[in-house]
Amino acid sequence: MDIVFITDELNNFYGAYTQRNIKKLMEGGIDVTITNQKQIRDSNPLYSGFYKFYLNWMGSPEGGRIRNLFDPKGPKITVRSFLRLLNFKANHRKVLVTDQRAIVSSSNPHDPSSNHSNVAVSFYGKAMEDLIKSELGLVEKDYPNIKSFKAEALEKSDVDLRVITEGKIYDALRENISKAEKGDKINIAIFYIADRKLLNDLAEASKRGVEVNIIADLNKDAFGIEKNGSPNRPALSELVDKNPDINVRWYETHGEQFHTKLAFFDFSNEDARAVLGSANFTRRNLQNYNLETDVEMILPKDGKIYKDIKNYYERIWNNENGEYTVPIEKYYEDGII
């Protein structure tokens, strides 16, 4: 059986060491691909240009002496691996594909992430082939059995689902926001939101009479490290200050993260749509700088997935059977992003 595991360089701290779980996979005969940064656009072109010309030739060998920034008890890192980190490139996808089903998720398979809030969709059918194709583009080895995989066609489905990656996620979000009119609802649940064009699109939708609701992470915790609330708190406080009809609630975290990435478009005169997966609503995640995978679904309102998403959102918005969210005023923050 072919098993292919594709991951980001972050897991080996950009060449400073081979992470123990990755080593176990390799020893067990599983093909591991560490995503090559060269396949990803430069999100920080000034630094990346300098890095490519002056530093890249040095490589990033193992055997460092610097404390691990992500795991103080973990292996030491090198100066070269830290300099490679500063390119800020990432394979941020979270997908699983078997011959039976596929999963696209916002969740990392990571012990410290186990308490986070996330969303995922499991599906089968022809969309699995598109997902496989997008992943095989990242590996050098040829896998004829995987490449030739044909998913069983669905006899009947009440959901139209397509796999979207990188900039196509941005296009799907902006297109759905732009077509929303008075009487429609846009419900967003998000870990990071800061893209200016997207925020402006939401502001314009609100002015058209669209009900815009946003549940966002407070950006105050990251694996035991206290953060300053950026980008969400200043970005959304400014958005509401200029557009008071937009409704924002913070997900009240207690050391964990609200790691969800979901946009739910509840149109009054047509089927709803949902976009969910790995992509945060930031420039790096949406404008072809990170590798990202989402799905866009067209959802009939008598279908199970429509009801599941609607009930999920209303439950945490209204604090049904628990305390999940708080008003924006509790953590309102002046500032400009």
Predicted stretch roles:
Residues 1-337:
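Charged, low-complexity intrinsically disordered terminal segments
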